[in-house]
Amino acid sequence: MFGVIVNPVSGGREAAGLAVQITERIAALGEESRIFETGGDGDAAAQTRAALAAGCQSIVCIGGDGTICEVAGELCHTGATFYVVPGGTGNDFARAFHLPKNPMAAFEAQLAGDPVEIDCGRMNGQSFLNVSGSGFDVAVLQKTEELKAVYPGEKAYRKAVLSVLGRYKAFEADVSIDGGAETHETCTIVEIANGQSIGGGMRVAPDAKLDDGYFDVVVVKKVPRMLIPLLLPAFMLGWHTKIGLARVVRAKNVTMRAKGMIVNLDGKLLRV
């Protein structure tokens, strides 16, 4: 049986109609399905547990990276098959699999393909599929939340990026890779990346792979103010790792300590 996890009011209530289309498509396959509606933060995880308890072995998530992250955290090591239907602003996880932007086309592509196993990261007990980030991307997400009351999601994000670029300050952190000695870093961004992109296509970890058993740890050190305007195009093209703005280390375990640290787990902010 398929369980369909959906926030019925997301996308101007389009998600609810999409969930019905998906259940109709599942019925055409001769399979049963049940819709599980979410209501707020953390509810996607609860509804996923309910779906598993109801006997669902295939889980469809309609949502953005944050909702997908919540659902995936409950599916690790369960043996359930996970279908992602992109319905957020950035949809970076769906982008990593080159899924079509059209939600139904993305679902059809997964039905036609074979399941693959991927890695799942854990940060202070919280799961993530794509990235755990600190620094610039956290500041952008915080500003985006402020602007959402005025602008729709994608426009709010673009305006937030431009706003933060002009005033962002680097932060201090102590970083240890795979149990090694701590190094003190003055950072613009630290990304512990399982996937390649954030923010709807900024390629912060252009060589990361979802199934290689490693994180790509991307450290962008303090950038001189005159070079800050280069950050955005460098991230979009993945050039920051090639022109000396960043260093990349592959690792299985990362420890980072910073005063008042907030991390971005697949689009959701967590104070650690």
Regions found by a protein language model. Name each.
Residues 133, 137, 191-205, 269:
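Glycine-rich phosphate/pyrophosphate-binding beta-alpha loops
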Residues 148-156, 200, 206-227:
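Gly/Ser/Thr-rich active-site loops/lids in small-molecule metabolic enzymes
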Residues 8, 62-64, 85-87, 194:
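Glycine-rich beta-strand-to-loop/alpha-helix junction loops that act as flexible
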Residues 6-8, 63, 221, 258:
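Short beta-strand/turn micro-motifs composed of small residues
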Residues 67-80:
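Short Gly/Thr/Asp-enriched flexible loops that form oxyanion-binding sites at enzyme active sites
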Residues 1-59, 69, 105:
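ATP/NTP phosphate-donor binding region
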Residues 3, 29, 77-188:
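Catalytic core of DAGKc-family lipid kinases
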Residues 15, 177-179, 184, 209, ...:
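ATP/nucleoside-binding phosphotransfer catalytic cores, i.e., glycine-rich phosphate-binding loops
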